[in-house]
Amino acid sequence: EEPAFKAISKLVDDVNILGVNVKLQSDVHDTITHIQEKAKISMMNAEIDELIIQAQTQAKYSSKNLGHFGLGFSSYSHFTSPIRRYSDLVLHRILKTKQTPKNIEDICEHISLNERKIDQLVWDFEDRKYARWASLHLGEEIKVKVVDTEKAKAVCYEKIFGMKVNLENYKGQKLFSKMRVKIKSADIVTKVIVATIM
């Protein structure tokens, strides 16, 4: 589905804060294209692509053919091969039998809801593993980039890629600023890792 106006408006604001001058265009596709063109010029493609992905609407399963906004397809469906998920199996059966189950809306809602739960479990597991690693590496320096300026959060981009840390002595550094930090504390139960900017 197309992202909400509020999300696209925030995207434009965030990109402007990074120093890349962009404006809302006539529609969402034109706005995203405009942002990506400006990102290439500023050499901030990777960072701005992260912001564009964050602005997108969460994918969900639907009994209606809503297309794929991000890919620009008016008709779209997807399953993996070999079949690994229940959603893949349902779609494969529909394609094979050319019949849509009567309870397809309930099936889609159930799959979407449970997929979110599974994602949450995976993120929870990863965050605990990161916290365990950090607890064994207290005092070590790592390289991070700021990913949330409001909550003073950064993500490691070396040694243990993807580990999120709270920046204890954050002083308003710019989004995506890269810096060295020292791991100060890590709590496996709360999954909170605190680091100090060097």
Question: Can you say where each PLM-predicted feature lies in the sequence?
Answer:
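Structured C-terminal cores of nucleic-acid metabolism proteins
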Residues: 1-198
